[in-house]
């Protein structure tokens, strides 16, 4: 019998809500009952999920002894590093010459990538603070990764993996941890007709490239595009690590045309938490293969190498660079609205990528790159927007005149070609002629040391 007020007397449209409320009340009541007040409490405790694991930290009683670390070092042939943060000099003496020299070096993202104690980002919206590991295994081969994973598991240690150090979530660093630093695992090998292991007869051969987990995208682009005449979808910033980008999905400058970088993944070698090296592809360990294409770097294992499908190059890569300042807040609102509308109407297509930024100083910075069209076509696309700017000189000023370039696609990441083709964009640093990245007609320093080799801002960090 249904009593007044029970769900059965409610209109049909309200019954689902009433049942949901009752379920919520039941769950809240059940959650409030102490575990020990229920029969079979031991069984319930054993069945309860472990929501957190307490790892051993430096200084804890269970922290490995010096002899333990030495045994690990011997196992990996002397590649264990005691991590020291270069920032320590600035904490101790912020006005010292050493600190000033460090901050000059920090302008070069390739220097940051070469230091195990540094990260390219820190404190994304103040959510975390970059902190160096205690030790790092400077892995040179898969066996080094296996040794590090086993050591961390057996000693209940925090374990982090760093390639490029670009993680916005801070997953490539952690205090009191052991780091697997993959920077030295940076080999690149091209294939004319690659078939994943176990996929013979199930998968058509594809042009592909196998890349070590520690390679930066600059190394991949140089091998695949400059030397090989092919394209592999990767990151817009060339200091990003290949493995981390793939495991995060992999959006890049030309993703509107080529898709996410993870979509090109054909196979990966992964060391899982049990210390086993596994090959993951569509034909074996398919669930792991699916998971690493977006699960986040190091979430499901340590990727040691990846094989990615390559594509034909377009005729040109190029870019449009400019900086426009509005002379009032109301003019900036007009500029913002116009830019968004123009982007929607003219740039939201497969040819265009990378960024437009709206700055607090009422300035609009344009650093757009393109593929599949040439300089003349790019100029025609943008002409209506720049005509609109020119019609209102009382409201807008051009801080950096527009620069539109195109480059035969094969040479987009070729420093020697850039030096020959853009001689006005050359500087000399420590006696060597180096290319500059061109942005809105102003040269921006690009440093060698495996440095940015592109005449476009997405190829490097901007330094004005």
Name these PLM-found stretches.
Residues 2, 8-464:
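Soluble FAD-dependent oxygen oxidases
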């Amino acid at each position: 019998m249904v009593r007044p007020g029970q769900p059965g007397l409610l209109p049909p449209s309200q019954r689902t809500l009433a049942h949901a409320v009752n379920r919520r009340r039941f769950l809240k009541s059940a959650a409030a009952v102490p575990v020990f007040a229920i029969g079979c409490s031991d069984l319930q405790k054993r069945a309860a999920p472990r929501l957190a694991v307490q790892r051993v930290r430096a200084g804890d009683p269970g922290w490995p002894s010096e002899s333990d670390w030495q045994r690990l070092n011997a196992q990996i042939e002397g590649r264990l590093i005691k991590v020291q943060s270069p920032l320590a000099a600035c904490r101790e003496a912020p006005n010292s010459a050493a600190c000033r020299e460090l901050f000059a070096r920090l302008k070069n993202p390739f220097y940051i990538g070469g230091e195990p104690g540094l990260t390219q980002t820190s404190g994304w919206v103040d959510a975390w603070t970059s902190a160096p590991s205690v030790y790092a295994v400077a892995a040179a081969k898969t066996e080094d990764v296996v040794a590090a994973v086993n050591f961390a598991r057996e000693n209940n240690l925090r374990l982090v993996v760093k390639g490029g150090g670009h993680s916005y979530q801070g997953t490539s660093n952690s205090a009191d941890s052991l780091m697997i630093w993959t920077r030295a695992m940076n080999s690149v090998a091209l294939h004319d007709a690659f078939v994943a292991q176990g996929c013979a007869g199930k998968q058509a051969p594809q042009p592909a490239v196998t890349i070590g987990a520690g390679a930066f995208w600059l190394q991949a682009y140089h091998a695949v595009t400059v030397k090989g005449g092919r394209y592999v979808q990767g990151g817009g910033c060339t200091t990003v690590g290949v493995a981390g980008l793939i495991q995060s999905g992999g959006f890049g400058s030309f993703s509107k045309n080529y898709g996410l970088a993870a979509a090109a993944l054909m196979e990966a070698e992964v060391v899982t938490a049990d210390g086993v090296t596994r090959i993951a592809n569509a034909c074996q360990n398919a669930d792991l293969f699916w998971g690493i294409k977006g699960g986040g770097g190091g979430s499901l294992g340590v990727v040691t190498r990846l094989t990615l499908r390559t594509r034909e190059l377009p005729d040109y890569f190029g870019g449009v660079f400019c900086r426009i300042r509005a002379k009032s807040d109301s003019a900036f609102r007009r500029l913002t609205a116009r830019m968004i509308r123009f982007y929607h109407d003219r740039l939201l297509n497969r040819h265009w990528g990378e960024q437009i930024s709206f700055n607090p100083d009422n300035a609009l910075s344009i650093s757009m790159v393109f593929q599949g069209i040439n300089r003349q076509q790019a100029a025609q696309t943008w002409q209506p927007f720049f005509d609109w700017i020119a019609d209102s000189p009382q409201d807008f000023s051009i801080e950096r005149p527009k620069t539109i370039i195109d480059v035969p696609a094969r040479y987009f990441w070729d420093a020697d070609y850039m030096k020959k083709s853009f001689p006005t964009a050359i500087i000399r640093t420590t006696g060597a002629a180096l290319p500059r990245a061109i942005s809105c007609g102003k040269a921006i320093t690009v440093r060698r040391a495996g440095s940015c080799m592109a005449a476009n801002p997405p190829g490097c960090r901007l330094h004005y």
